[in-house]
Amino acid sequence: FEEKKGITVWHPDARVFVVKNANGSERGLFLADYFARPSKCSGAWMSALQSGYKLGHGAKPVIYNVMNFAKPPAGEAALLSVDEAKTLFHEFGHALHGMLTDVTWPSVSGTSVSRDFVELPSQLYEHWLTVPAVLEKHA
């Protein structure tokens, strides 16, 4: 994930990242809009502006996560509660599911899968939140 400056998005708080494969090739774009504001819907979600697929000329995914965390004062880190961190990991799991999709047909790309499977990647990611190595690095 490499932050990409200079891309116009819906709000100055939203950030854009180019996602690259291990070989350096571009995989897609990830947009993160994490802070609450008066004009923003409540809740947290992942969605795709563009699904990734190989049909025809194919398309690279453009995935976004929206959260409603309290914005910290300028220059300070955003501190999250355990529940907020769990939500972040859950929605980022959905984002990775959308970003790492490798399918021919757009109709089955990313989270466009059976209801009994769509929550699996996000819930697995939630559980990584409590892995000691993850806590040591990010908490």
Residue spans for each PLM region:
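Cation-handling catalytic/transport regions enriched in His/Asp/Glu
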Residues: 1-139
